[in-house]
Design a protein with these regions (language model features):
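Eukaryotic alpha-helical solenoid repeat scaffolds
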Residues: 99, 103, 110-134, 138-142, ...
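Helix-turn-helix repeat elements of alpha-solenoid scaffolds
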Residues: 35-41, 71-72, 86, 110-126, ...
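Start-of-helix register in tetratricopeptide repeats
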Residues: 24-25, 58, 140-142, 147, ...
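Residue-level signature for tetratricopeptide repeat
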Residues: 32-33, 49, 66, 112, ...
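Boundary/linker segments of alpha-helical solenoid repeat arrays
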Residues: 54-61, 91, 171-178, 201-215
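Short, charge-rich amphipathic alpha-helical segments embedded
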Residues: 39-75, 167-175
């Protein structure tokens, strides 16, 4: 008698492939809903995707991230002022970065969708405020609007708002770093180097590297981090190693206090 074919074994790979295709499609749909600011719809699709493919680490990661944002944005409806709503959304990134640091991986597609969700929703709140001429000269609002456009990949529009904010609030390290970052993203490397140098010499502690996106500054951050520096100490050493590595190579005359600080730091290496 001939052996009957093992139908379980022959059908299993096809079934797994079909399930994987189904979960991949649901994951893409979830990311699309996330970009449309539909957190609940994204959550529902991710739960369906997990039913299709329970071992998919990216789906599990995305579920954790969406749950986090649902939990941490509940109180936004209690805020009445559009500026407060938008600023609150962006402020949550600092806690979110800590949360992400506790996870094994940070899947880029997921994080792109999260950033798109936050910045597009925040920008929705801010844009209504910009119709008021008085708000068009508020450097705090202009900074947040510029940061939103940068996060959404519209670098030219980001630069317009950030440069306007910098004209109002000169020698602000946070603003200078943002303008430098956008210039680097626009391949204006010489300008970016000069502005980053300026920002870090003015006040490195005001610069949040977690909001920086350009390879120019992130590579320098990684170099200093690999030397064992962390947190506030890392920020203080970035201008020193930026000078030594030639990243801050665009020349300008250092103020006396800046030159003294730089020499002292180099002697300590």
């Amino acid at each position: 008698m001939e052996n009957e074919p093992n139908t379980a074994q022959t059908s299993l790979p096809g079934a797994l492939s079909e399930a994987s295709r189904g979960s991949d499609e649901l994951l893409k749909m979830a990311y699309a809903k996330l970009k449309d600011s539909s957190l609940d719809a994204a959550l529902s699709l991710l739960e369906q995707a997990l039913d299709h493919d329970f071992d998919n680490d990216e789906i599990k990661h995305a579920l954790k991230c969406v749950h986090w944002w649902i939990e941490h944005t509940r109180r936004i409806d209690d805020l009445r002022n559009p500026y407060e709503k938008g600023a609150f959304l962006i402020s949550q990134f600092k806690q979110y970065f800590v949360f992400l640091g506790q996870l094994n991986n940070a899947y880029e597609q997921c994080q792109y969708a999260i950033r798109f969700f936050v910045y597009s929703k925040a920008l929705y709140f801010f844009e209504g405020l910009l119709s008021n001429p008085a708000n068009q000269h508020d450097p705090g609002l202009l900074l947040l609007v510029g940061r939103c456009f940068k996060g959404l990949g519209n670098f030219d529009e980001a630069l317009k708002y950030l440069e306007e904010a910098l004209r109002i609030k000169r020698e602000d390290a946070e603003l200078l770093a943002e303008v430098a970052d956008v210039n680097a993203l626009l391949s204006q490397t010489k300008t970016a180097k000069a502005l980053f140098r300026e920002a870090f010499f003015i006040d490195p502690q005001k610069i949040d590297l977690r909001f920086m996106e350009s390879a120019l500054i992130l590579k320098l951050r990684d170099i200093v981090s690999e030397l064992g520096y962390r947190n506030e100490e890392l920020l203080e050493w970035i201008p020193v190693y930026g000078y030594l590595q030639g990243v801050f190579s665009v020349k300008r005359e250092l103020k006396q206090v800046e030159a003294g600080r730089l020499k002292q730091s180099i002697f300590l290496i």
